[in-house]
């Protein structure tokens, strides 16, 4: 399971001219689900994402996680993160989980975030989405479990 996380001052996702999720300061999480992923991996990745200390403390040091910084989380499914780009000029998506399994794990991940009392907004699974963000820093990390 892969999360591309970006520290943002704001972010939103729109589907068919409807804003489905919008946050102020916090994390934009682009989430990719791979074939071998399960609930245990989703739990570990959620723990890492929410615990990752990439927000500044009073001394300006990256020392706070999203909850300590009072931030929110916007989770957007992105199957392209599981692509194999090793060869050729066209990505292969054979490493991605089947859509039904990917959706179940995506929803599980979102629910785990919400259980941590963090404002968690979402896109719409498998939809064509427009994502807007203001990357703060920029600060972007690739987390994989």
From Swiss-Prot:
<protein>
    <recommendedName>
        <fullName>D-aminoacyl-tRNA deacylase</fullName>
        <ecNumber>3.1.1.96</ecNumber>
    </recommendedName>
</protein>
<dbReference type="GO" id="GO:0000049">
    <property type="term" value="F:tRNA binding"/>
</dbReference>
<dbReference type="InterPro" id="IPR023509">
    <property type="entry name" value="DTD-like_sf"/>
</dbReference>
<dbReference type="GO" id="GO:0051500">
    <property type="term" value="F:D-tyrosyl-tRNA(Tyr) deacylase activity"/>
</dbReference>
<keyword id="KW-0378">Hydrolase</keyword>
<dbReference type="Pfam" id="PF02580">
    <property type="entry name" value="Tyr_Deacylase"/>
</dbReference>
<comment type="function">
    <text>An aminoacyl-tRNA editing enzyme that deacylates mischarged D-aminoacyl-tRNAs. Also deacylates mischarged glycyl-tRNA(Ala), protecting cells against glycine mischarging by AlaRS. Acts via tRNA-based rather than protein-based catalysis; rejects L-amino acids rather than detecting D-amino acids in the active site. By recycling D-aminoacyl-tRNA to D-amino acids and free tRNA molecules, this enzyme counteracts the toxicity associated with the formation of D-aminoacyl-tRNA entities in vivo and helps enforce protein L-homochirality.</text>
</comment>
<dbReference type="GO" id="GO:0043908">
    <property type="term" value="F:Ser(Gly)-tRNA(Ala) hydrolase activity"/>
</dbReference>
<feature type="short sequence motif" description="Gly-cisPro motif, important for rejection of L-amino acids">
    <location>
        <begin position="137"/>
        <end position="138"/>
    </location>
</feature>
<dbReference type="InterPro" id="IPR003732">
    <property type="entry name" value="Daa-tRNA_deacyls_DTD"/>
</dbReference>
<keyword id="KW-0963">Cytoplasm</keyword>
<keyword id="KW-0694">RNA-binding</keyword>
<dbReference type="GO" id="GO:0019478">
    <property type="term" value="P:D-amino acid catabolic process"/>
</dbReference>
<comment type="subunit">
    <text>Homodimer.</text>
</comment>
<keyword id="KW-0820">tRNA-binding</keyword>
<dbReference type="GO" id="GO:0106026">
    <property type="term" value="F:Gly-tRNA(Ala) deacylase activity"/>
</dbReference>
<comment type="similarity">
    <text>Belongs to the DTD family.</text>
</comment>
<dbReference type="GO" id="GO:0005737">
    <property type="term" value="C:cytoplasm"/>
</dbReference>
């Amino acid at each position: 399971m892969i999360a591309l996380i970006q520290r943002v001052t704001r972010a939103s996702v729109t589907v068919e001219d409807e804003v489905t999720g919008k946050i102020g300061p916090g994390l934009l999480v682009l989430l990719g689900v791979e074939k071998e992923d399960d609930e245990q991996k989703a739990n570990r990745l959620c723990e890492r994402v929410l615990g990752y200390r990439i927000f500044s403390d009073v001394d300006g040091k990256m020392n706070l996680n999203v909850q300590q910084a009072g931030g929110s989380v916007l989770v957007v499914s992105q199957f392209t993160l599981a692509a194999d780009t090793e060869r050729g000029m066209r990505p292969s998506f054979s490493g991605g989980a089947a859509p039904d399994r990917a959706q179940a794990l995506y929803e599980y991940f979102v629910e785990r975030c919400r259980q941590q009392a963090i404002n968690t907004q979402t896109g719409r699974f498998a939809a064509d989405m427009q994502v807007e963000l203001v990357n703060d820093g920029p600060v972007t990390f690739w987390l994989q479990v």
